[in-house]
Each structure stands twice: as structure tokens, then as C-alpha cells.
């Protein structure tokens, strides 16, 4: 039995070669080479957690029955659609954030000769998703639901990104806007729907379920996505760069991070003044003052408290779900993220 990741990568190669021969467009050698290089650079490079989660969830929903080759292929194809969606978001996000590196390599728009061709590449990535769905799912009873699901989640993610961008607008930096409810809204829409709900929703559609009957599952997964982002915010400041694989810049970037929101909540007037004067400034001295304040306020303790409360709440919700198979899916997600260090 090949390991799941290499079987999954084989499906990527099949989907890529189908897209490079799409009959709707007459490729020249140059354009075919461009798209192939763009795909290889942006789609398969990450941890592939979202994509692999579709297969894991589908297996659990099938109560551990052996999947046949077609079922594995289709679940993998949907997993890749999520990875394509992620690639599309990241290519465009990196331009908006003026980022330099992604997954240890230069961002796509920083690659020589790419530059501002990257926004169009993002649009191409987005348009590959319905091409894959049409080719492999058009005859399925849940085809329209799949299209609808991807469209809805993309809309939610783009809207979350918009709230994030307009909150950190240059010249309009206002810490008083930063509240737990704003943080929650950004996270829920920008991250939780596509990273946590979408893989499970794909698997539910494949086993013939109606998503309208699973709003409880959606709510639990969005809650998990929120917890995941709070962890991310915490690790950005308190995680070891060699473990998390990046140097955190949330303080410099004036991000609506859980840490700054919590700090505002716990600060007295004097401490608030330190935040207002130093948060969002690139100078290391300003950043150091914010970090010192975070330690004074014992944000590590506040995070540990948040973590244990989230654990109790989520485990209670999961164990209250009537379906053991669905519980299995939710528990497998939870096991991947609880107490992670990176």
C-alpha cells in the first residue's frame, strides 16, 4: 500500500495533465509550460492537510469500509480542489501583503518574469476548480451542491480577507477597533470555512448527505478553526521560529491578533498607552516593548486558560453528536490541532 501522501500526489499529476489538455483552450507550447510551472510552484508545495482531510473524513464516514480506486480518486480530486483554492488565495494574498517568502521560497509574484502576471495566474487557479469538478463529478447527484459549496466558501473567505485588509489600512490604524468579536469574524470567514468546514463538507456530499442537515457539524468545525487561528496568533509571538518555520510579524504588521485583543482587554490605562504607542511599528525596539507588556500581562497564562476552556467546550460538543462516524471525523481534526507547536 503506497503511503497516502504519495498516492494523493499521483492524483495531482493526473489532474494537472488533464488541465494542460483542456479542450476549451488551445494551448501553445509557451502557455502550457507557463501553466505547468505555475501549478507545480503553487499547488503541491504545502503540508496538504486540507486535501488529505477529505480522504480521511470520507473513510471515517464510510465506517472504515475499504474504499475502491474510484472512491479514492474522487475524494483525492476534491482534496486537490481545496488545495487549488488555497493556492489561489495565497498567490493573491502575498501580493496584497507585499510578502517576500512563502513555504521557504520567494512568493510567486517575486519570481523573475512573473511579477504582475501573478494576479491572472490566481484567476486561472480559481478557474481550474470548476474544470476539475465538471470533468469528474458532472454525473454525480451532488454535482450542483459541490459547485455551490465551493462558491459559497470562496465568497466567505474573500469577505473575511476584506475585513482583515480594511482593518489594517495604512493611515487608519486604530487599536480601539480591535475586539474579540472582530477577531472572531475575521478568523471565521477568512480561515475556518475553507480550512476546516470545506474538507468535511466535501466528504459529507460524497456519502450522499444533505449539508443543510449538518449545521451543527459546520458550527463545531468553525469553532475549531477559530481555536486553530488563536493558536497561530499565539505561536507567532511565543513559538520558536525554528519550530514554526517562520519569524512572526503580527506585531509589526498591526494584525488583529488574539494576543493584542486580549492585551487590550487586560491592560490598565498606562499599559494601553504602551500598546497604542508601539503596536504596528516595524522598529525592533517597539516590538520588544509590546512583547514585554505581553509577558507582564501573562498572556501565556491567558492562552493556557483559553486552550483548556476550548478543549472542554469542543469535546463536549463532539461527544454530543448523534453519529459515531461524524464524531470520528471531528475527533480526527481535533487530534491534529490540539496542543500543536507549529
Swiss-Prot record:
PROSITE patterns: POLYPRENYL_SYNTHASE_1 (PS00723), POLYPRENYL_SYNTHASE_2 (PS00444). Its EC number is 2.5.1.10, 2.5.1.1. GO terms for molecular function: (2E,6E)-farnesyl diphosphate synthase activity; dimethylallyltranstransferase activity; metal ion binding. Pathway: Isoprenoid biosynthesis; farnesyl diphosphate biosynthesis; farnesyl diphosphate from geranyl diphosphate and isopentenyl diphosphate: step 1/1; Isoprenoid biosynthesis; geranyl diphosphate biosynthesis; geranyl diphosphate from dimethylallyl diphosphate and isopentenyl diphosphate: step 1/1. Transmembrane segments: none annotated. InterPro entries: FPS1-like, Isoprenoid_synthase_dom_sf, Polyprenyl_synt, Polyprenyl_synt_CS. Dimethylallyl diphosphate binds at residues 102, 190-191, 229, 246, 255. Binds 2 Mg(2+) ions per subunit. Isopentenyl diphosphate binds at residues 47, 50, 86, 103. GO terms for cellular component: cytoplasm. It is found in: Cytoplasm. GO terms for biological process: cholesterol biosynthetic process; farnesyl diphosphate biosynthetic process; geranyl diphosphate biosynthetic process. Pfam families: polyprenyl_synt. Keywords: Cholesterol biosynthesis, Cholesterol metabolism, Cytoplasm, Isoprene biosynthesis, Lipid biosynthesis, Lipid metabolism, Magnesium, Metal-binding, Steroid biosynthesis, Steroid metabolism, Sterol biosynthesis, Sterol metabolism, Transferase. Mg(2+) 2 binds at residues 93, 97. Catalyzes the sequential condensation of isopentenyl pyrophosphate with the allylic pyrophosphates, dimethylallyl pyrophosphate, and then with the resultant geranylpyrophosphate to the ultimate product farnesyl pyrophosphate. Belongs to the FPP/GGPP synthase family. This is Farnesyl pyrophosphate synthase 2. It comes from Lupinus albus (White lupine).
Amino acid at each position: 500500500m503506497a503511503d497516502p501522501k504519495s498516492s494523493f500526489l499521483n492524483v495531482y499529476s493526473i489532474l494537472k495533465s488533464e488541465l494542460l489538455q483542456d479542450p476549451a483552450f488551445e494551448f501553445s507550447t509557451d502557455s502550457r509550460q507557463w501553466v505547468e510551472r505555475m501549478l507545480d510552484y503553487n499547488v503541491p508545495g504545502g503540508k496538504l492537510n486540507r486535501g488529505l482531510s477529505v480522504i480521511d473524513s470520507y473513510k471515517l464516514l464510510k465506517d472504515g469500509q475499504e474504499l475502491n480506486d474510484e472512491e479514492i480518486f474522487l475524494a483525492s480530486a476534491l482534496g486537490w480542489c481545496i488545495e487549488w483554492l488555497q493556492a489561489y488565495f495565497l498567490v493573491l494574498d502575498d501580493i496584497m501583503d507585499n510578502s517576500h517568502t512563502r513555504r521557504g521560497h520567494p512568493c510567486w509574484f517575486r519570481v523573475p518574469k512573473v511579477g504582475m502576471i501573478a494576479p491572472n495566474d490566481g484567476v486561472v487557479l480559481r478557474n481550474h476548480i470548476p474544470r476539475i469538478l465538471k470533468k469528474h463529478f458532472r454525473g454525480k447527484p451532488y454535482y450542483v451542491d459541490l459547485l455551490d459549496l465551493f462558491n459559497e466558501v470562496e465568497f466567505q473567505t474573500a469577505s473575511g480577507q476584506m475585513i482583515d485588509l480594511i482593518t489594517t489600512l495604512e493611515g487608519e490604524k486604530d487599536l480601539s477597533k480591535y475586539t474579540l468579536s472582530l477577531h472572531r469574524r475575521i478568523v471565521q470567514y477568512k480561515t475556518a470555512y475553507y480550512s476546516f468546514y470545506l474538507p468535511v463538507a466535501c466528504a459529507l456530499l460524497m456519502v450522499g448527505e444533505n449539508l443543510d442537515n449538518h449545521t451543527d457539524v459546520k458550527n463545531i468545525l468553525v469553532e475549531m478553526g477559530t481555536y486553530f487561528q488563536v493558536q497561530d496568533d499565539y505561536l507567532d509571538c511565543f513559538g520558536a521560529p525554528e519550530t514554526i518555520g517562520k519569524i512572526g510579524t503580527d506585531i509589526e504588521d498591526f494584525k488583529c491578533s488574539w494576543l493584542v485583543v486580549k492585551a487590550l482587554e487586560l491592560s490598565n490605562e498606562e499599559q494601553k498607552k504602551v500598546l497604542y504607542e508601539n503596536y504596528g511599528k516595524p522598529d525592533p525596539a517597539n516590538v520588544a516593548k509590546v512583547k514585554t507588556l505581553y509577558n507582564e500581562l501573562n498572556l501565556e497564562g491567558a492562552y493556557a486558560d483559553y486552550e483548556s476552556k476550548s478543549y472542554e467546550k469542543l469535546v463536549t460538543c463532539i461527544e454530543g453528536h448523534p453519529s459515531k462516524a461524524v464524531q470520528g471525523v471531528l475527533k480526527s481534526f481535533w487530534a491534529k490541532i490540539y496542543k500543536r507547536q507549529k
